[in-house]
Amino acid sequence: MNNKIEKNDNNFIYKIINEDFKKNKNLLLHTRFPPEPNGYLHIGHAKSICLNFELANVYNGYCNLRFDDTNPVKENIKYINSIKNDIKWLGYQWHKKVRYSSEYFPILYEYAKELIQKGLAYVDELTKEEIREYRGTLSTVGKNSPYRNRSITENLKLFEKMKKGEFKEGEACLRAKINMSSSFIVMRDPVLYRIIFSTHHQTKKKWCIYPTYDFAHCLSDSIEGITHSFCTLEFQDNKNLYNWILKNTSIKHYSKQYEFSRLNLEYSILSKRKISILIEKKIVNGWDDPRILTISGLRKKGYTASSIRDFCHRIGITKQNNLIEFSMLEYCIRKELNKKAIRTMAVLEPIKIFLYNIDNDHEEKLIVPNHPKHLHLGTHEIIFTNTIYIEREDFKEKYDKKYKRLKIGEEVRLRYAYIIKAEKIEKDESGNIIKIICFCDINSLGKKPINRKNPAVIHWIAVKNSFPAKFKLYNQLFKIKNPDQEKNFLSYLNSNSLIVKNGFVEKKIAQKIIKKMSNNFIKLFFQFERTGYFCVDEVDSKENKLVFNRTVSLKDSWNLKK
């Protein structure tokens, strides 16, 4: 795997690290990726994964995987397993064992007691609502809790009672004693521990008090010897608390936090809470729906690990929040698939063509390239007969001078085959076209037409060589560029985010896919000529009907359709 982050990159993180190496030539760079196991990873997490793991690789350091498992109510083993699989799939390996913040609960508890003993923490019995009210706002200072000046002895006893489960949830919490008038709201006596009676996936029922993210995060970083703790800009103010906790405990290693801009992508939302709403309302079909930008959703859609890494490298790391064009993500996968995807033909929404001057028993084998520019990818065989399918969109009954595909009295060339001319149509009782009767120029194979223009080319499949398939055409989930900024984001859903069409693929291609499905399935990518790049949906596909997910169109046509 190529690491695109290099020591000569002109970004602020590179400059910070190089300055640190100038000050300490023996510095061992140590980063970490610390997800909370309460959901699935998305493209925004991929940006952080690439940053942390590749910096460690480039600077010959280490990168830890640590689960920030401080809220047992929202966490689940299935998320842990999914996150580990996604990181490996992206091409990275963490340093030594997987780590958990819960491993450090005993020592975190001791650090909390140390703050109490220094008069820097107290047990508060205000309700959540009262704490919120006492905290104040950006324009008004907070006010002290009536429990703020309890003695050290009393606070130690009360904290022990919390640990023993002698308080109910919400009856007490441990707060840092900092400054209720601070201009940073996060520094207005933040909660360090709260009571949660819930079974933890790692520690089971050993604990009923749990450290908050802010308390556990900085101490876990320092316990592990993390030298550079990277997070997104929304945690910029939290750095003050990060540093305060480390400064006021006896921890030996002092980690440092640095912030970079989070990923904001056009026509998308990356908030776990909002994605959960989409799933609960059945707007999308779970966390691996290709319309949401989870790693599992992108993988199901046909995105490769290398294309996601390429995207993360291209957008770079900055301190300025900006909205990344969706077309850049599509460009990365389109560029890759253009090189390696097998070219084949698929017909969506088919209509039948009958070539009346070709014998019924005629069956001609044609050898076509798997990729016109990469001959090493080989060839495959297609069959030409007198009855074929073309796409309904490739025929127009009413005369239209601008229409360049098949119409009555006009010609088209069948891809890799002959020129045909439409002469008449057959309809059913409802007036729907069921068959187009055409003449086939049997002297046109591989030749330009004589004394007439070279016609447009359309794709096709012989009925005898067809295999039924379903095609899922995915588009952006939202109609506006930045739905994440809208309070009523559901009002901007794109009703055409998923269009399902039926049709056919080449039989021999289908047979190869089915054979691979019965063994260890390796994702297969295709360019269905004139249609787009597709992958096999290995979950929904059956032996009698394959399902294909459109990964990306052949060209960036989204902006043209809006």
Swiss-Prot record:
What does the UniProt keyword field contain?
Answer: Aminoacyl-tRNA synthetase, ATP-binding, Cytoplasm, Ligase, Nucleotide-binding, Protein biosynthesis
State its location(s): Cytoplasm
> Gene Ontology cellular component?
cytosol
Q: Name one GO biological process term.
A: glutaminyl-tRNA aminoacylation
Q: Which residues bind L-glutamine?
A: 68, 213
Q: Name the enzyme's class.
A: ligase
Q: Which GO terms describe its molecular function?
A: ATP binding; glutamine-tRNA ligase activity
Highest taxon of the lineage: Bacteria
Could you identify this protein by its name? Answer: Glutamine--tRNA ligase
